[in-house]
Amino acid sequence: KEGPALMSRAVIADRYRLSWLALRRRLDILKGRATVHPLAGLFYWTSPGERLIIAPQELRTADPTRASEIYAGRFAFAGKIVICDGRSPFEMDPPNEEWAEELLGFSWLRHLRAADTAITRAHARALVDEWITLQGSWHPLAWQPEIVARRIISFLCQATLILDDADLRFYRRFLRNLTRQVRFLRATDTRDGIPRLQARIALTYASLCMAKQIRHLRGATRRLVQELERQVLPDGGHIGRNPGAIIEMLLDLLPLSQTFSARNVAPPPAITNAIDRMMPMLRFFRHGDGTFALFNGMGPTSSDVLATVLAYDDARGTPVANAPYSGYQRLDAASSMLLMDTGGPPPPELSAEAHAGCLAFEFSSKQQRVVVNCGMPGSGRENWRQVARATAAHSTVTFNDASSCRFLDFAPFRRLFGVPIVEGPENVTVARDSEHDAIVLRAAHDGYAERFGIIHERFVSLSADGNRLEGEDVFLPATGNAMPDEADDRFAVRFHLHPAIRANRLTDGHGAVLLLPNKDVWNLNAHEDVVAVEDSVYLAGHDGPRRTSQIVIYGRAREVHRVHWSFSHVPQTTPAGWRGSPREQLPP
């Protein structure tokens, strides 16, 4: 039923739309390439930035030990290591595209700056000079707009490192190349989402930091404000629905705001307002252990980066409970917390990292995550990325082993759009209330309505003391009173567990006991249904994929219209007869 022959009209329309966007993207790159052609001066006149006025602050954390590795010719990016053996890294064959993108974005210069020695400064200058020689005029990957944007920001932020002790010849050569990159980016559109926003930020930085670029500040700022108003939602979330995008935006916007002030120019109110909206969302998505919830492309949380950004949060208030524009809900009670995805997928061109996880939730107690989603793996693990986006990788319900969204894996689009979502839940309803001193959430989605004729409705209730989480999954016919054919009604209610949790199935089969690292015990009770404890994989670990467990309730919607389950805290230590064992790390 999911083959190309039955592809809906909406999917076909989205394919045509993506084809048009892909054509526009290629035309934009051709236009941008014309601006860096050796004869471009005959057609494009741009005053060179004769000098740099200011170097913005870099908020991304740096490791001075990485400088020694780079000096030794070991370039470790995206989970891969390339040893240069005296050759330039820009002449090496990259092990994967992610490695090449990190190399060509030059964000790693911050590690050399952290070492802050004459040797690292000279080495940084030599590497930049090598790149200008080998790829500074043109290179098909190095001159992709999103990489150019990242490189402009890196060159400006690390200008002190690059130019300290530089001779006049290199100084002028560097500025000529930087001007060329700015000119290219100004003439080229970038793919939608965070890359486009970073391009707007890069051009605004250039207008503030380069002496002869100030005349472009008004236009650059106007375009940046337009993107902020479009991409940052009223509740502070990002239009692409990835929680990690908030951190990425703030890492660039916070120092940009400071750069405006350093030039005695008031930052546009839209920048300040966007920052003020995003800051509370940092706390909204955080569990008790400080990590972000694993929804829609979120992978491992960099605790040091998050702490750096949170240091700019003057309010330090209680997290908001409701993010309706972003499509998330949060329940807090005592030391327990639940986060649920209650939104549909973003537009196809913004959905390269979005997941089919509607109505999935994560649950934590104190400083320990209990129920999680599998999460997005770190860079360099492409074989896991599409697995992570499937509905089965989330703590929600699947029907017939299918995802609630359709993904379009079409080779011509992969470089430009990844694997976008072209069909998913269109109607997601959510209601929030309080009943009997408990916070109650009711939500439903129609992601399975067209294919299987089923509406999934989920009810969750968290007690005031945080010791009991009640839940119910209800399966309703999408039209009339008829349930789907027997062949189409197989469901699985999944609860993926954090790798630190040990799970043991109860002898009656109707539940499981969960032991937390702090020796707290929680019971999962499935009441009238039978549970299975199965293997799962936690993908969002800093050290790679890890084995873990999932608790699954299987059934048929024609026979079981409601599945009632609950998690309850047990005031006792390790239960007698415990047979659980710690989880192991998976091979990459």
Per-range role (PLM):
Residues 3, 8-9, 91, 149, ...:
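CBM-like, beta-strand-rich accessory domains located in the C-terminal region of large
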Residues 2-85:
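Extreme N-terminal leader/anchor segments
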Residues 75, 329-333, 361-363, 506, ...:
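Short acidic-hydrophobic surface loop/beta-edge motif
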Residues 96-275:
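Aromatic-lined, polymer-binding surfaces characteristic
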Residues 40-66, 80-114, 195-207:
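Long, acidic, intrinsically disordered low-complexity segments
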Residues 233-376:
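Carbohydrate-active enzyme catalytic cores, enriched for enzymes
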Residues 104, 199, 327, 359, ...:
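Residues that flank catalytic or metal-binding motifs in active/ligand-binding sites
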Residues 67-68, 322-324, 354-356, 390, ...:
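Short solvent-exposed loop/turn micro-motifs enriched in small/polar/acidic residues
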